[in-house]
Amino acid sequence: MKGDRLIVALDTPSQEQALEWVDSLPQVLWWKVGLELFTAAGSSILQALKERGKRIFLDLKLHDIPHTVGRATEVAVGYGVDLLTVHAAGGSAMLRSAVAAAQGSSCRLLAVTLLTSISPPQVRQELGIEMDPADYVLHLARLAQAQGFTGLVCSPQEVSRLRQALGPEVLLVTPGIRLGQAKAGDGDEDQQRICTPDEALRAGADYLVVGRPITASPDPVAALRRFQALWDAAS
């Protein structure tokens, strides 16, 4: 498995627990810090990861008025993170504000299209969007690309279409990765649009984001090896 293409999500409010996972899986280069951990630990978790030589995906899904998102982006890239998420649904002005704030930094902005926790029926029934989910994702992806975004977060089910439509230069980061034992909506499974690592890679994903299937496993090292086997099979 290419360790620089796997991003492990630190889904915990505890910095101590997060760093225990990081230290127990030294072969993993990329780590995702989301709202839960960032709200609990603040920038100290980012500093701890940088001290360990890790690369950081700060997944805050910024979505506010353009001025606020621009200022928040400026602060976030100042932490030295490598990837930062912004909601594409915030509109063109908001997206441009984020791009302007990140200009000159080494941070790459990723536009979030449609959360992988949202099922196709919810798109119409709850969001009121009279589009096929795949069409809606492509619409938001093109909107973000037109404002200067060069990376996207999308479900594995949309990777192939986005790759074909947007070309090889767009960075596609894919959550909703499972080993196959979890079904959408089962138990504490939030993700609705999921697939296995080999399926996502064959579809054209650049990075895979995996959280609980590794960190909540009784043996995270063994779980990582299982992902490695599927990854190698897709290579």
From Swiss-Prot:
InterPro entries: Aldolase_TIM, OMPdecase, OMPdecase_AS, OMPdecase_bac, OMPdeCOase_dom, RibuloseP-bd_barrel. It catalyses: orotidine 5'-phosphate + H(+) = UMP + CO2. The active site is at 61 (proton donor). Its EC number is 4.1.1.23. Coiled coil: none annotated. One of its GO terms (cellular component) is cytosol. SUPFAM superfamilies: Ribulose-phoshate binding barrel. PROSITE patterns: OMPDECASE. HAMAP family: OMPdecase_type1_B. This is Orotidine 5'-phosphate decarboxylase. It comes from Synechococcus sp. (strain JA-2-3B'a(2-13)). The lineage of its organism: Bacteria, Bacillati, Cyanobacteriota, Cyanophyceae, Synechococcales.
